From Swiss-Prot:
Keyword hit for Secreted: yes
One Pfam family, short name: Cutinase
Active site: 117 (nucleophile), 169, 182 (proton donor/acceptor)
Gene this protein is translated from: cutA
Organism listed in the record: Botryotinia fuckeliana
Signal peptide: 1-20
Subcellular location: Secreted
Triggers of expression: Induced during infection. By contact with cutin. Repressed by glucose.
Site (Transition state stabilizer): 118
Name this polypeptide is given: Cutinase
Cysteines paired by S-S bonds: 31-106, 165-172
Molecular function in Gene Ontology: cutinase activity
Task of the protein: Catalyzes the hydrolysis of complex carboxylic polyesters found in the cell wall of plants. Degrades cutin, a macromolecule that forms the structure of the plant cuticle. Allows pathogenic fungi to penetrate through the cuticular barrier into the host plant during the initial stage of fungal infection.
GO cellular component, one term: extracellular region
Length: 202
């Protein structure tokens, strides 16, 4: 028989066990109208970075409604050696895998592939790793400060591709200098969100 102290402890711990219960299975079944797979730039922290990822997500939520968009960041080193290789190879594969798994679990979502700086390299690389029948399902591709500026995103038509490069951005010119022009793409996120919305037909 439980003592009153044991009963009290059980009563106190029960709410904690409910809070700690995994909710992933419920969340996994909830597919957004728009899903963005985003790769951050070199040396940025987290998976969304700071220069473009967060303001782009905010702009998308404003344009589409907070319940209609999900942004998933690519987990990769985002280091200088990866940039010099033309985009981290493992990160590029990770992004391609995320595209495949997202379309498998949420076939009706409007899938967007996006990246900033080295993240743009990952967008190009991931698209090349995917079969044509998969890239045909990508709603749009959006790249900010693209080191591969001028190159198409394989399998994504030009009218569904938005590559944003500022005048004076050395990275967009094929260089490796980080100048002010490369650090101000947050200002372009509202227009980019409008592009995503139009491409998705929403």
């Amino acid at each position: 028989m439980k003592t009153s102290a044991q009963q009290l402890l059980s009563a106190l711990l029960l709410p904690l066990s409910v809070l700690a219960a995994p909710t992933g299975s419920i969340e996994a079944r909830a597919c957004s109208d728009v899903t963005v797979i985003f790769a951050r730039g070199t040396t940025e922290t987290g998976t969304l970075g700071t220069v473009v990822g967060p303001p782009f997500l905010a702009a998308l939520k404003s344009a589409l409604g907070s319940s209609s968009v999900t942004m998933n960041g690519v987990d990769y080193p985002a280091d200088v050696p990866g940039f010099l290789q033309g985009g981290d190879p493992a990160g590029s594969q990770t992004m391609a895998t995320m595209v495949t798994s997202t379309l498998s679990s949420c076939p009706d979502t409007k899938l967007v592939i996006s990246g900033y700086s080295q993240g743009g390299q990952l967008v190009h690389n991931a698209a090349k790793l995917l079969p044509a029948e998969t890239t045909a399902k990508i709603s749009s591709a959006v790249i900010f400060g693209d080191p591969d500026n001028g190159d198409p995103v394989q399998g994504v038509s030009a009218d569904r591709t938005d590559i944003i490069c500022h005048a004076g951005d050395n990275i967009c010119q094929g260089g490796s200098l980080i100048l002010l022009a490369h650090l101000t793409y947050g200002m372009d996120t509202t227009a980019a969100a409008a592009f995503v919305k139009k491409a998705a037909g929403l």
